[in-house]
Amino acid sequence: MALSEIDKQLLKRCLDREPRAWEDFVDRFVGLVIHVVNHTGNSRSIQISEQDREDFTAEVFLAILADEFAVLKRFRGASSISTYLTVIARRVVVRELLKRKISAM
């Protein structure tokens, strides 16, 4: 799927560190990230508390911010940005769930 013009401009604004770009990015994709957090927990029969949901969502956005937006810089447009972020979010949530499982042992 081709990258929409809106998403293309939003990515460019984030990478150029334009004012309000990050806030617009979060506003656009926070619903998707929360959905992925919930779905990832449900698919593993794990009840995710509201606090965990907020923590996991924050971890996803921190992962995107890490290393000067390295995750966004690696996006090549082979899929929609939503599909790409879904994969990123799922990986972050699974990693966080595993960390919590290990620390609970």
Positions of the model-derived regions?
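Residue-level preference for hydrophobic side chains embedded in well-ordered alpha helices
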Residues: 25, 29-33, 56, 60, ...
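Acidic, Ser/Thr- and Pro/Gly-rich low-complexity regulatory segments
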Residues: 4-9
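Arg/Lys-rich amphipathic alpha helix in sigma70-family domain 2
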Residues: 39, 87-105
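Generic structural signal for alpha-helix termini and adjacent loop/cap motifs
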Residues: 17, 66-70, 99
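Amphipathic C-terminal alpha-helical segment
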Residues: 35, 66-67, 94-95
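Short, aromatic/basic-enriched loop-to-helix "N-cap" motif that marks the start
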Residues: 47-54, 69-87
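Short, charged helix-capping/linker segments at alpha-helix termini
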Residues: 16-27, 34-59
